[in-house]
Amino acid sequence: MDSQRNLLIIALLFVSFMIWQAWEQDKNPQPQQQTTQTTTTAAGSAADQGVPASGQGKLITVKTDVLELTINTNGGDIEQALLLAYPKTLKSTEPFQLLETTPQFVYQAQSGLTGRDGPDNPANGPRPLYSVDKEAFVLADSQDEIVIPLTYTDKAGNVFTKTFTLKRGGYAVNVGYSVQNASEKPLEVSTFGQLKQTAALPTSRDTQTGGLSTMHTFRGAAFSTSDTKYEKYKFDTILDNENLNVSTKNGWVAMLQQYFTTAWVPQNNGTNNFYTANLGNGIVAIGYKSQPVLVQPGQTDKLQSVLWVGPAIQDKMAAVAPHLDLTVDYGWLWFISQPLFKLLKFIHSFLGNWGFSIIVITFIVRGIMYPLTKAQYTSMAKMRMLQPKIQAMRERLGDDKQRQSQEMMALYKAEKVNPLGGCFPLIIQMPIFLALYYMLSASVELRHAPFILWIHDLSAQDPYYILPIIMGATMFFIQKMSPTTVTDPMQQKIMTFMPVIFTVFFLWFPSGLVVYYIVSNLVTIIQQQLIYRGLEKRGLHSREKKKS
């Protein structure tokens, strides 16, 4: 087996992966064209979980250096969230909107107090209408945090204070509750946190461009418990009313999309119930409800939860809750992608440019794999040396395939040649390539990350297709340098067009991945020359010109 035939193996694996990606993408809810009503049936369904829907209240805004939140005083839900450090598109001055409440699309972070005496319990009437001393809160330059207290007093005189605390540069929102019991009997309350979202994206929010070369990232719900580090929960599963219902200590519930995460993290020592719910009208929810606590007459008790609403920055999320960093969707090759990203981030801390960091990590990966690459070329050289003997054996045995196979294996054994030796390094390289593919497409640090010259976003395709063409040229050069024993006309034609086929595929790949492949090909050319020189000394290679 020679190096050009190996390209056929790569192509087969590559195309199979692209087809699988397209199939996975087709299984998810598709962007919707029609207007979706979101305000009629949510209340009743949510009430089944002890979580009523929001009503009309006053909207207050909270702005820090990185977040701008809109909170409805009816229930104290966060109805909008703007990420000020992340533009909507590369050239846009408009910030990315993560949470949103419109007739077409709803994505909210709800929270409050349920339980027997909780003001958010539907049995106790409408959701609490909190009072607040002003409608706009802005983090001053001299402040490190900002506190927004919302207060509600029920008919019995019990005072419930819901406090949002945001820190400078942070995406973790502390949501605290103070329950002051003014009655003559104990109050039984539970905290809840719920994320609800329209399952089908409107076209205005669709981030998937479609096609075989589009990276599909998971959009849906997820949770973590004391027994399960991380598990995804598809929106389709919730729409089919196959709902989650699990009790656990610790953990979190979340909704994910490419680059961004919203998650509720209960802050208590008791047991929490994690659930999902189909709220009707195409809206799904995931949330938690804590076990009840008793607040004695004349006493004040404090409860706590944390909301992460922002970019999926792994180290910062891991500091908020164990395993929350796993919400960065690196797919089934996460165990390779995560170490690669940590290495890439370490290199970036010195270079300050993600593109050059990718180049360095390419040299590191190819350097580590050099022994396998050398073994691959050595195996292929030995296979070429055996071709005259194999051809003579085939002519001698004619159509007796069984004897051909037996004698061929005996020949390999006698000559100490592994017929699969040329394939194994390729099989090892493919997962690394795909892991980089996932890493570059799911790491928010690479979103809109510039390189040099015309490459302003390493996570997006080359707008002028220059990098894919360079990649195709390096692939063509490697092909021309590689000796071949392929005589089948069809295989020869396929291999001739292989650089063109790969160039077309790479037109829509992230620029960072194309940079990796170009540098990898250049390293291959250098390594190829070094290996061939060593093989020449052993009489396993000669620098004869390839026949065109």
Curated annotation (Swiss-Prot):
Sequence segments annotated as region (Disordered): 28-52
Domain of life per record: Bacteria
Low complexity composition-biased segments: 29-41
Gene3D superfamilies in UniProt: 2.70.98.90
Positions of transmembrane segments: 6-26, 345-365, 420-440, 458-478, 499-519
Lipid bilayer topology: Multi-pass membrane protein
N-terminal signal peptide: none
Family: Belongs to the OXA1/ALB3/YidC family. Type 1 subfamily.
UniProt protein name: Membrane protein insertase YidC
Organism placement in taxonomy: Bacteria, Pseudomonadati, Pseudomonadota, Gammaproteobacteria, Enterobacterales
